[in-house]
Amino acid sequence: MKDFFTFIDNCPTCFHAVENVKVALLAAGAMELQETIPFHLESGKTYFVTRNGSSLLAFHLPKCEQGKRPSGYRIYAAHSDSPCFKIKPCGVMKAEGEYVMLNTEKYGGMILSTWLDRPLSLAGRIVYEKEGMLVTKTVNLDELTCIITNVAIHMNRDMNKGVEYNPQTDMRPLIGLSKDMPELRKLIADKAGIQQDSILGEDLYVYSKEKCCLMGTSEELLGGPRLDDLECVYAGLQGFLSALGTGDNAKDKAALTDCITTEGGYNTEGENDSEDEHTTV
């Protein structure tokens, strides 16, 4: 369970999730393929390919006698992203001339009220220039804490009768006061260890800083952020690694696990994209 909690804590965004899955696969002896480079596959080997840094597909080719198909298939799929707030391109705005807030939009099927009155932070991916090349890097501004606040009960006496939140006007994360607030890109650059003017773009999300924990009198319950859908990503990874065993039950079976972005989406990393469409087993 400790490893699972660590995985959740280390994966505030889909980019971090794929990065951590990739590390685990490489440690297990898997080889990374590039979609743009022709490759040759060998039986008995394990491979994986990533797309956009947010989706990953891994597969194992069993050793079979020539002319024979695998005796079975182990196939699993999950999505690497979680419902959250995505920061818009013009991501910083001021309210009443003093409060610095994030300009965000809904991402995924969110339960809006669960984001109120709890410590939040920002993470994602940046693109920057290095020696004339475009480089991507994941970032986690975990030292920054922001918050989406409820109004005081005095200001809305009907609060406990049910409130419909407008995510565009009622749920902008507050990150500081204008007189004390450094530029967001400077915070990103300092965290990434690069020059601020080398950053060309960022893809950032708001995430909950709360940690996973066991609950209940016998610790039989589990709670934490991003369980949708990182619990399935972790389960799929562990199942895939277990399927690479050397026993008789595993040696002639193919295995495949898929971590995609925007489940059901038709974008280049979604469930209905060409990466999945052209995967045959």
Question: Residue locations for each model-derived region?
Answer:
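N-terminal hydrophobic/helix-forming segments and targeting peptides
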Residues: 1-281
